[in-house]
Swiss-Prot record:
Lineage: Eukaryota, Fungi, Dikarya, Ascomycota, Taphrinomycotina
Name the record gives this protein: Protein ilm1
Side of membrane Lumenal, spans: 28-56, 103-112
A cellular-component GO term for this protein: membrane
Domain of life: Eukaryota
Transmembrane segments: 7-27, 57-77, 82-102, 113-133
Organism: Schizosaccharomyces pombe (strain 972 / ATCC 24843)
Amino acid sequence: MLFSFRAIVLFYCCMLTFAGIGFLWNPKFVVESGLVALIGASMEVKPLIVTQDNLSTLALSGLVFLILGMIYTISLLQSNFLFFSGITPIRAIFDFILTGFIYLKKEHIASNSLTFTFAFCDLMWQFWMFAAMSEERAKYLKNQKKAEELAARKAREVEES
């Protein structure tokens, strides 16, 4: 793999935190960014227009992104591989369904360029994390096997004494 699993997750945490701060600080900057416009236009999804009515929704989205960034950062610092191996496929399936729904139902209220860009980019990151997870999974299983062997050896030593 070009980047390690930890590097991919760390960059993903930074992106979530940046998006969260962007939505809280200046949501118009995030909504009107080039990536959102490019992906939205390429999929022919209507653009989201920032108004006074949807500022609270964008701020709530910013808080959700910040919380997600903190959850992923804490799990990364704890080396909680089981969290990532459980949540990554679920998030990928959810993002795939959301992306397909937005593309097929272009008149729905949730179908806009910002939502599609988030779902598409998040799907890309989840697949990338899942692909990089194979190396991490091998290390985790190796450490688990060593821990089980050590526990069995200690149990035999206790029985012998």
